Amino acid sequence: MLKPGMILCDRYEILDVVGAGGMSIVYKARDHRLNRNVAIKVLKPEFSNDKNFVTKFRIEAQASAGLTHPNIVNVYDVVDDEGIYCIVMELVEGITLKQYIEQNGRLNMETAINFSIQIASGLEACLLYTSPSPRD
């Protein structure tokens, strides 16, 4: 786990943990070269020595980097800093849909439709970009 104040690639300063998934941890960081906050998705250390996981992580980064859509975060950089594998992305401040529902209760029809349209629009962009096969 990276610590606040740690610098990656002489550029990205780790500020805080944003969240974690099965194979990665997401940090809020400061890009000192471009003077902006970013999200950095870091492959967990237990997977860093596994060539298959590193390959999957790089493929994810490359696939994400090619997508441009208002409902999909932008990928800015892919980093390998002494065995620390990272995807540097646009930082989206706010709450998750789950948190929104927990705070506001059940979605009314108009809000549910609005969110669904935004999600579907982002998914459509992913599908068009990746050219899925019938098995997908």
Feature annotation, model-predicted:
Residues 82-96, 100:
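Conserved short submotifs of the Hanks-type protein kinase catalytic core
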Residues 129-136:
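Conserved small/polar residues in nucleotide/adenosyl-binding loops
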Residues 19, 59, 68-71, 84:
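Flexible N-lobe loop architecture of eukaryotic-like protein kinase catalytic domains
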Residues 78:
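Activation-segment/catalytic-loop signature of the eukaryotic protein kinase fold
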Residues 30-37:
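Conserved N-lobe loop of protein kinases adjacent to the ATP-binding glycine-rich P-loop
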Residues 115-116:
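Activation segment signature within eukaryotic-like protein kinase domains
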Residues 44-66:
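AlphaC helix of the eukaryotic protein kinase fold
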Residues 15-21, 26:
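Protein kinase glycine-rich loop
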